[in-house]
Structure formats: C-alpha cells, structure tokens
C-alpha cells in the first residue's frame, strides 16, 4: 500500500536506484505546488520587462503553467527531477582551453554528440515504464491510474528552480545549477507523475549556495552577459550571451559583439570551464554524448566546406540542427573573421558568398574585412 510514509519512502528509494541504474547522476522529488514557482515567475517577469530575453518570445507565454506545473499534466502530484552528466573528457581545471585553438570550431560540450533532449526523454520514458511495472507487481491498485509525462527543456517549466528544490544543486551566479560533488556539466530532466511522493526535505537542506564571493564566471564571460540584479541575485542578459547569439538568434549578430565571440560557433562553456566547482565534474556514463563527426576538434574551414546536405547529414540527431544551415554558416563566418590572418580563409569566404543568404553574406563581408585588417 502507498498510504504510509514508510512505503512512500521505500518507493522513492526504489525509484532513485532505478534512475541511477539507467545512468542518471541524481534524482529528487518536488511537489507541483512548491511556492518556488510563483517566486520564480516574479523574477522572470522582471527579466522580461528589461528585454533580457531578446527574441525568445516563448518566455512571454504560459506563465500560469510556469507558476503551477500541475496545469501541464492533469493529476500531477509529484515531479521527479533528474540530472545527467555529459562531459566526455575532463577539461583543465579553472582554464578556458578553447581559446588556445583559434582555427578550430568550438561547440558547447553538451552539443557535440546526440541531442540530449532525445536521450533524456528516452531515459525518462524507460524510468516511467519501470515504475509502471513496479506498481503493477507490488501496488496494483495504483497501476491503472498511473499518469506520467517526461520533459527536458521542452515545456514552460522552471527547470533549474525545480531541480534546486529537489536537492540536485544550487543556482550559481552564471544561473546554471551546481552540485558540490559534481560541478555543473550536466543536463536536467523531469518526470511528472500522479504518485503522491513527498519532497526530499533533508536532501534539499544539505545543498545550499557555495559561490560565496567568487566572481570567476562573471569576469571570464567575453560579453559580460552575467549581471547582478538590484535584489542581489544574478541573471544573464541573453542579448549578450554567446549561447543565445549562436543558437537562438535568427538574424544579424550585433557587430560590436562579433569579435568577442571568437571561434565559438554553437554555444559557450566559458563560465563553466572557469568555475572552481567543476574540478569535481563527473564524466558521462552513457555513450550518447561522445562527439560525432569530430565536432570536438574540427577546423573552421572544414565546417565552412559543408553544403546544406552535409549539414543535414552530419547534424542528424544533433541539437546543432535546430540552428539551421544558414545561421550555422553565419556563425562559422564570424569565427573565420576572428581567426588569425589567412589568405585561404579570405578566398574560401568569397567563393561561398554567392551561395548563402543576404544576411549571411553581410557576416561574410564583415569577416573578410576583419581578415584584411590583419594582413
């Protein structure tokens, strides 16, 4: 029976064990009526009022669901929050080695392998099926009414705040979640369920913010996107964030920000690479995050040689595909402009210019001029 605290705790312990066996690094439980969601909505609305979301208009919608996650899935009584480590190789501690390879394309580490959204949802569905089987075997009275739905950065959910309430870490000044024994190189996912599983109060109480006076992530950010708010908290101005500029932004990258992007063509890891807590970063336990098509070492000119079909073929099942071929080439053009002088770069930029959109051509012209300025 699921009507006693001991039995509920036993089921939670079983779920945690299954989650770990599937490859999740951690697992916690949150009630959908947790007051943190209303508090986060206030912060979101302030952020929106300042225009810091840029063109990400989806942040303006579904505020009722953000404040009350139960509206997303009927009969939700608990949310299982999980995290999944994605590092394949440990980076040098407290340094940004990406800056040492100006002719290479730098892609955020989470995006070099399979799209984590697909991986996460697949694992969460497997976890849900295991729970369903457990209920059928040991608690048949709950099996028929069991409702679940997996999410991974795919719905209006305050994902980091939810994970923080589940005891999976604290929100750092770079606004990413940090675990004291695992750093921040992990992705998050949620499984909404109809089971009345209580929050892990003890687990939550053992993890509090330990950023202290450290400002490493703030200082290392090339565009100074991390800002302290009047309330003493920190947020990220997406309009300045390299991840936003190279992934979410559809159109022209502001000219004044292009030199600061360097050779980052999809996302940016700088604020994580410099974080002292990532000396504890754990490596991935599944192969999905292994780099595909040498995306951990590929040169800018190699990527520039891709045509539209190459892009579709080599980004199949990858989060990179969502940025689209033309914007991807826009990003590579900017990086080529920032690379050391090379006549070969100038020649390749001009050869490909007629094949791309007017918007990308403008970035090619900028990149060409940057190269000429170094000659």
Where are these regions (language model features)?
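Alpha-helical adaptor scaffolds
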Residues: 293-326
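Short coil turns that connect the paired helices of HEAT/ARM alpha-solenoid repeats
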Residues: 321-323, 351-360
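Auxiliary alpha/beta "docking" domains used to position bulky ligands
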Residues: 1-209
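Structural detector for internal amphipathic alpha-helices that build alpha-solenoid repeat scaffolds
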Residues: 329-340, 361-371
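Amphipathic alpha-helical scaffolding segments comprising HEAT/armadillo-like alpha-solenoid repeats
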Residues: 310-314, 341-353, 373-375
């Amino acid at each position: 029976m699921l009507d006693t605290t001991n039995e509920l705790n036993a089921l939670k312990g079983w779920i945690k064990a299954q989650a770990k066996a599937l490859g999740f690094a951690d697992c916690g439980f949150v009630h959908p009526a947790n007051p943190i969601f209303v508090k986060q909505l206030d912060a979101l609305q302030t952020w929106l009022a300042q225009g810091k979301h840029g063109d990400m208009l989806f942040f303006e919608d579904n505020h009722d669901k953000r404040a009350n996650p139960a509206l997303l899935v009927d009969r939700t009584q608990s949310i299982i929050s999980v995290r999944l480590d994605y590092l394949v190789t440990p980076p040098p501690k407290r340094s940004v080695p990406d800056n040492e390879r100006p002719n290479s394309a730098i892609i955020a580490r989470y995006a070099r392998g399979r799209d984590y959204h697909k991986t996460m949802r697949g694992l969460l569905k497997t976890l849900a099926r295991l729970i369903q089987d457990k209920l059928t075997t040991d608690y048949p009275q709950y099996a028929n009414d069991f409702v679940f739905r997996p999410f991974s950065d795919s719905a209006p959910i305050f994902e980091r705040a939810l994970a923080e309430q589940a005891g999976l870490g604290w929100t750092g000044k770079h606004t990413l979640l940090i675990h004291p024994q695992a750093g921040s190189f992990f992705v998050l996912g949620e499984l909404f369920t109809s089971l009345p599983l209580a929050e892990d109060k003890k687990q939550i109480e053992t993890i509090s913010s330990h950023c202290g006076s450290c400002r490493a992530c703030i200082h290392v950010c090339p565009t100074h996107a991390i800002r302290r708010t009047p309330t003493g908290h920190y947020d990220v101005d997406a309009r300045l964030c390299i991840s936003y500029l190279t992934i979410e932004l559809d159109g022209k990258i502001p000219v004044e920000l292009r030199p600061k992007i360097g050779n980052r063509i999809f996302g940016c890891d700088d604020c994580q690479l410099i974080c002292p807590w990532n000396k504890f970063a754990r490596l991935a336990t599944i192969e999905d995050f292994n780099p595909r098509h040498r995306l951990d070492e590929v040169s800018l000119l190699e990527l520039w040689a891709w045509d539209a079909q190459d892009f579709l073929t080599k980004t199949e099942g990858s989060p990179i595909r969502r940025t689209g071929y033309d914007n991807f080439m826009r990003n590579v053009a900017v990086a080529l402009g920032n690379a050391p002088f090379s006549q070969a770069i100038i020649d390749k930029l001009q050869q490909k210019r007629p094949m791309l959109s007017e918007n990308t051509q403008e970035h090619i012209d900028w990149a060409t001029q940057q190269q000429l300025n170094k000659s």
